[in-house]
């Protein structure tokens, strides 16, 4: 029996919701835990979990982009129409990212420097990724060709990241332009807490390649097998990257595993692919769609809850004193944020239906 379109898309919303929860816990513990609590095992695992929300959001943006593109192609839209539609949406997200920076700058007065207006954040890079993917789809027409091109671009971005952060830095560019390449911002070296094109766009293009695979005729007819294949491939990719990283030789003059390594990119991508397969199985056979699913609900309003929660965790209206709480206190705050964002999401959905 074939799954309905709603069932097919639920696991993508569920994955976005999971990314939201991982984002909440990362931000809450990072903002609120005291210096002594930051030495706890909880904080260590929280930071490790914090390496996945951005890859998930970008990867899922790539899949959604492929779904939209495939829908337009099935409607026999021209290549030019597809490019205009997708690039326009990417530009809208990029503009929202700029607006978000303006909001944070104004709410951060009198302490926030004007340079924060030009900080490269996750919304900026999602918008840029979508515009770049739109341009790629104009050059590579056809599903198979587009999938191969997207996978190739993801690989090239991952491989080019280490030198663009170190030995091949485009230092002649103004800092606000170089920051989109390697996240240097106003500092002497690239900053790992920013979201430049290298390496972050690679996750979006990887998602685009996966999305085109999932929209193929074979994958539509054998969806469970297709997701299982992706999950197994992801596990194999992560294992292979771990093996490569253990080798003593390196092709890069400067090697930074946690921030620029192609191996770390491949490990995270492999885990994300396995999570995608797991999310699909959970929504199809598990409790993911037994009645109301908080993760699916959050996933459908991920932009809204991202936008709102930041100010109540990191901003002027933080519900707890920053860097002053025990693990228990910060965990209670996390529960409050999760509940509030879920209620906000439900309220937004109800208003949309009226």
Predicted regions and their residues:
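Alpha-helical transmembrane segments and their immediate juxtamembrane cytosolic regions
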Residues: 1-354
């Amino acid at each position: 029996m074939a799954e309905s379109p709603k069932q097919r898309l639920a696991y993508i919303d569920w994955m976005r919701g999971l990314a939201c929860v991982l984002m909440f816990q990362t931000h809450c513990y990072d903002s609120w835990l005291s210096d002594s609590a930051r030495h706890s095992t909880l904080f260590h695992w929280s930071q490790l979990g914090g390496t996945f929300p951005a890859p998930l959001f970008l990867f899922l943006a790539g899949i959604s982009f492929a779904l939209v593109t495939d829908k337009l192609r099935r409607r026999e839209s021209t290549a030019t129409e597809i490019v205009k539609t997708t690039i326009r949406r990417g530009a809208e997200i990029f503009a929202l990212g700029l607006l978000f920076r303006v909001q944070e700058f104004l709410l951060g007065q009198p302490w926030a420097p004007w340079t924060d207006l030009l900080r490269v954040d996750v919304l900026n890079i999602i918008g840029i990724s979508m515009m770049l993917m739109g341009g790629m789809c104009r050059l590579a027409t056809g599903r198979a060709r587009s999938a191969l091109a997207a996978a190739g671009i993801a690989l090239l971005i991952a491989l080019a990241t280490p030198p663009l952060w170190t030995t091949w830095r485009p230092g002649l560019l103004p800092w606000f332009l170089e920051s989109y390449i390697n996240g240097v911002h106003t500092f002497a070296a690239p900053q790992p807490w920013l979201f430049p094109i290298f390496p972050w766009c690679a996750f979006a293009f990887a998602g685009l390649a996966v999305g085109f695979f999932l929209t193929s005729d074979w994958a539509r007819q054998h969806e469970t097998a297709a997701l299982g294949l992706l999950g197994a491939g992801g596990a194999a990719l992560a294992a292979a990257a771990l093996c490569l990283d253990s080798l003593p030789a390196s092709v890069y003059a400067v090697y930074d595993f946690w921030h620029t390594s192609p191996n770390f990119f491949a490990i995270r991508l492999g885990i994300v692919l396995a999570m995608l397969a797991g999310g699909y199985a959970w929504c199809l056979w598990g409790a993911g769609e037994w009645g109301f699913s908080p993760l699916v609900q959050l996933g459908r309003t991920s932009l809204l809850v991202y936008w709102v929660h930041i100010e109540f965790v990191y901003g002027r209206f933080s519900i707890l004193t920053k860097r002053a709480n025990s693990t228990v206190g910060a965990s209670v705050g996390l529960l409050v944020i999760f509940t509030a964002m879920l209620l906000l999401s439900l309220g937004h959905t109800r208003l949309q239906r009226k």
